[in-house]
């Protein structure tokens, strides 16, 4: 499946909730879901009742879009989560949260996950002192993510760091704003994921 390149706001309207795909805009009255709270398209205002399968599919699509993944990537994460000990749905969320691009976003270096993914790809960060450019790297407890010296004057990054208080930093992460770095204090647990996600629906879908 090719990566979606259309308007991000259409995805929020499709899932009938804010996915926070456009950074600061999502916190303002300009957010599309606040102005047009119905699906996109000619017949969008006539919402239909979904079947059990349809509900599961929509939940999977919602989670996939929140983290900006293609179907094959997402299915791979589910397969890995299913092999791990513990609850599959919670394992899945933990794997998604520990992606490097998501950690960069959670620490406040970017206003959206798509922006954080681009920053990582362009080599603006180091992981444990080594330059990295792979957004999907799985971070571990004790890992240190630091903004490279040459990137510390980028306006968008500083604006995002100044605004992070509005979103908050999860308890499993720690940010040193003055040093432009953060670290993983612990593994994320289910309670750390505050986005309304029903991961069990995803498990049920892939278990068919």
Swiss-Prot record:
A molecular function (GO) term: rRNA binding
CDD domains (alphabetical): S4
Positions of transmembrane segments: none
Record key words, sorted: Ribonucleoprotein, Ribosomal protein, RNA-binding, rRNA-binding
A GO-annotated cellular component: small ribosomal subunit
The UniProt record lists the keyword Ribosomal protein: yes
PROSITE patterns: RIBOSOMAL_S4, S4
Pfam families: Ribosomal_S4, S4
Sequence ranges assigned to domain S4 RNA-binding in this UniProt record: 98-159
SUPFAM superfamilies in the cross-refs: Alpha-L RNA-binding motif
Biological processes, Gene Ontology terms: ribosomal small subunit biogenesis; translation
Described purpose of this protein according to its UniProt entry: One of the primary rRNA binding proteins, it binds directly to 16S rRNA where it nucleates assembly of the body of the 30S subunit. With S5 and S12 plays an important role in translational accuracy.
Similarity field: Belongs to the universal ribosomal protein uS4 family.
Protein name: Small ribosomal subunit protein uS4
